[in-house]
């Protein structure tokens, strides 16, 4: 009985298991990626912070879960993922995340489209 009360308490507090739902066109990338950041600044290798976490999350989702870890540091793995995403979506693979890369990532994330394969 005590275990049942503990489980009920955890579920009521929001620690229950959630199921994955499909993203709708109204779902923003920041909602899909835990709300790390809503700003989309120019990013490049060695940057860090919440905007990098948002980038990493969108890359992770857009590259069929083969993107970088979401750690907030734009290191070699993030650079490689950015360049792969840019190549796959027809952008110059310069590793710099600017307005065009953000726009492609946002579209990919917000539409709930199939991950990029190339």
Swiss-Prot record:
Pfam families: PG_binding_1. Gene3D superfamilies: PGBD-like superfamily/PGBD (1.10.101.10). It comes from the Bacteria. This is Uncharacterized protein in bpoA1 3'region. It comes from Kitasatospora aureofaciens.
